[in-house]
UniProtKB/Swiss-Prot annotation:
Aldehydo-N-acetyl-D-mannosamine binds at residues 167, 189, 191-192, 208. The active site is at residues 137, 165. GO terms for molecular function: identical protein binding; N-acetylneuraminate lyase activity. It comes from the Bacteria. Homotetramer. It comes from Escherichia coli (strain K12). InterPro entries: Aldolase_TIM, DapA-like, NanA, Schiff_base-form_aldolases_AS, Schiff_base-form_aldolases_CS. Optimum temperature is 80 degrees Celsius. One of its GO terms (biological process) is single-species biofilm formation. Optimum pH is 6.5-7.0. This is N-acetylneuraminate lyase. Pyruvate binds at residues 47-48.
Length: 297
């Protein structure tokens, strides 16, 4: 059902203007930039997209704009997860209407929901998605929901679930999931272990830094398919040098600043309460943008 969703999917950033409103022009440029750099698809409205500091209406606007701009050129996954099941269902219905290829939802968080309540939440969203496959989003570090392997196995076998975004450093668990579910579309979620995730059984990945250097991750996929471990390791190391800097600057604002220097994003600001990048990092981020533009050619 979801086999065509395999690949390298950028977790799309959401640009804002100086007044903190959606910057629709920059969003369109960012979609085109990702298409041009050879990304297989976009994961829209997730953690990287700052979904949880946006209104429901804004999240729907983002989905609509991305769908218009992508025009069937790449695969589109709409993250529709909210704490509220009803709001998640509304976004899922919108994703279906706009022509997305799949929906995704993080486990509902903040309140200590039971596992059966998690399952019911996903069933309701799947129903509203009207045939679109569900990508279960497991990110325990941010959601606070620590699913056991048995619980993951249950979620990914719910009717309508076609994939799992596994944002965890537990590569043993990644391998266990792959072993148990050989046909499941399985995404690596942490960019810094992309190559290791593929070796542990992931089909591809969904990541934030793909927005600025997606071709490197495609290079890792190609190298591993050819059995060239040395090249894959080298590319992962180069990616991780960038990630080291972004962790210091704040990942989302750092990425937006790099894209600003690449003339893709007009204003390199995140939605408050996120603050701006510390000015001391601007020279490094500008140099990184120049390096990546030269590398991409």
């Amino acid at each position: 059902m979801a086999t065509n969703l395999r690949g390298v999917m950028a977790a799309l950033l959401t640009p804002f203007d100086q007044q903190q409103a959606l910057d629709k022009a920059s969003l369109r440029r960012l979609v085109q930039f990702n298409i041009q750099q050879g990304i297989d698809g976009l994961y829209v409205g997730g953690s990287t997209g700052e979904a949880f500091v946006q209104s429901l209406s804004e999240r729907e606007q983002v989905l609509e704009i991305v769908a218009e701009e992508a025009k069937g050129k790449i695969k589109l996954i709409a993250h529709v997860g909210c704490v509220s099941t009803a709001e998640s269902q509304q976004l899922a219905a919108s994703a279906k209407r706009y022509g997305f290829d799949a929906v995704s939802a993080v486990t509902p968080f903040y309140y200590p929901f039971s596992f059966e309540e998690h399952c019911d939440h996903y069933r309701a969203i799947i129903d509203s998605a009207d045939g679109l496959p569900m990508v279960v989003y497991n990110i325990p570090a941010l959601s606070g929901v620590k699913l056991t392997l048995d619980q993951i196995n249950t979620l990914v076998t719910l009717p309508g679930v076609g994939a799992l975004k596994q944002t965890s450093g537990d590569l043993y668990q990644m391998e266990q999931i792959r072993r148990e579910h050989p046909d499941l579309v399985l995404y690596n979620g942490y960019d810094e272990i992309f190559a290791s995730g593929l070796l542990a059984g992931a089909d591809g990945g969904i990541g934030s830094t793909y927005n600025i250097m997606g071709w490197r991750y495609q290079g890792i996929v190609k190298a591993l398919k050819e059995g060239d471990i040395q090249t894959a390791q080298k590319l992962q190391t180069e990616c991780n040098k960038v990630i080291d800097l972004l962790i210091k600057t704040g990942v989302f604002r750092g990425l937006k600043t790099v894209l600003h220097y690449m003339d893709v994003v007009s204003v390199p600001l995140c939605r408050k309460p996120f603050g701006p990048v510390d000015e001391k990092y601007l020279p490094e981020l500008k140099a990184l943008a120049q390096q990546l533009m030269q590398e991409r050619g």
